[in-house]
């Protein structure tokens, strides 16, 4: 079975490759430059903004994992449209998409890249599963976040203290994606994350358990968080991230639907915060 993994050297794609390899599969890593890929899978260079490049990569693939990398809204829209066109042309047997926590629907009249991607893929007629994580636990390992934990015993993050989220790790999401790539009978939405949703205090408690020292949660403004991550992602990369947290500030919570959760549909339960920290040796 030929399985192509977008962004195979990145935070989302690399764990999917590792999970598939552990299951005895031979995934193909779709990366920007195969000569710089240091992973253990076979690799192919792909320009996600080029329909021609995508069609070449997709041809012969039985299953494809797709997600949009961090970038400006314009860059992501270009990639979404190119991916849709390539899938429509090639018609692979199976496509699995991660929304990466991005909102599908935006303000009236505003095209959201992930919304454009999903609408086009659904119209293509291919077997499609959509994995919908909310927030990744790995965000809590960003240097601006971990410095607060280790220096001040404070977990600072741009969410209200009462904002419940179905947090999930990339490791848990990879397990779900790998399962779906190998099982085309499951289609539609599959939510990944903690049920019930976790509050900031729950996250801090996980760090407290792992570090064996008290850690408290402190809500941060999206703008303050954005200023701290610009050195990591650049302004173009940080802007949509900050916008997503401004959007979250207007919402009641971000909890997956139990009926369409991976727990219900696939029998897969995500790690606790403390277990995840132990697994990644943070």
Positions of PLM-derived features:
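Short glycine/proline- and acidic residue-enriched helix-loop micro-motifs
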Residues: 66-69, 260-261
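Conserved acidic residues
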Residues: 41, 62, 93
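Oxidoreductase cofactor-interface core, primarily capturing Rossmann-like NAD(P)-dependent enzymes
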Residues: 2-34, 49-52, 59, 68-78, ...
């Amino acid at each position: 079975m030929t399985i192509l993994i977008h962004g195979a050297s990145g935070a989302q794609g690399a764990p999917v490759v590792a999970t598939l390899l552990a299951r005895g599969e031979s995934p193909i890593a779709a990366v920007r430059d195969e000569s710089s890929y240091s992973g253990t899978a076979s690799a192919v260079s792909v320009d996600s903004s080029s329909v021609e490049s995508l069609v070449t990569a997709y041809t012969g693939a039985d299953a494809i994992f797709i997600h949009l990398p961090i970038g400006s809204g314009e860059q992501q829209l270009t990639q979404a449209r190119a991916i849709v066109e390539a899938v429509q042309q090639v018609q692979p047997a199976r496509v699995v998409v991660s929304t990466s926590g991005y909102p599908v629907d935006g303000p009236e009249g505003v095209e959201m890249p992930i919304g454009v991607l999903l609408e086009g893929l659904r119209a293509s007629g291919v077997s499609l599963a959509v994995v919908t994580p909310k927030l990744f636990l790995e965000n809590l390992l960003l240097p601006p976040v971990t410095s607060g934990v280790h220096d001040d015993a404070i977990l600072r993050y741009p969410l209200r203290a009462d904002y419940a989220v179905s947090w999930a790790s990339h490791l848990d999401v990879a397990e779900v994606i790998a399962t779906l790539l190998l099982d085309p009978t499951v289609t539609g939405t599959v939510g990944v994350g903690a049920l019930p949703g976790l509050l900031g205090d729950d996250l801090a408690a996980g760090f407290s358990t792992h570090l064996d020292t008290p850690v408290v949660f402190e809500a941060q403004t999206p703008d303050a968080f954005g200023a701290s991550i610009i050195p990591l992602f650049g302004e173009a990369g940080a802007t949509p991230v900050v916008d997503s947290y401004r959007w979250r500030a207007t919402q009641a919570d971000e909890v997956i639907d139990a009926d369409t959760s991976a727990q219900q549909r696939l029998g897969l339960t995500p790690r606790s915060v403390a277990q995840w920290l132990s697994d990644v040796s943070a």
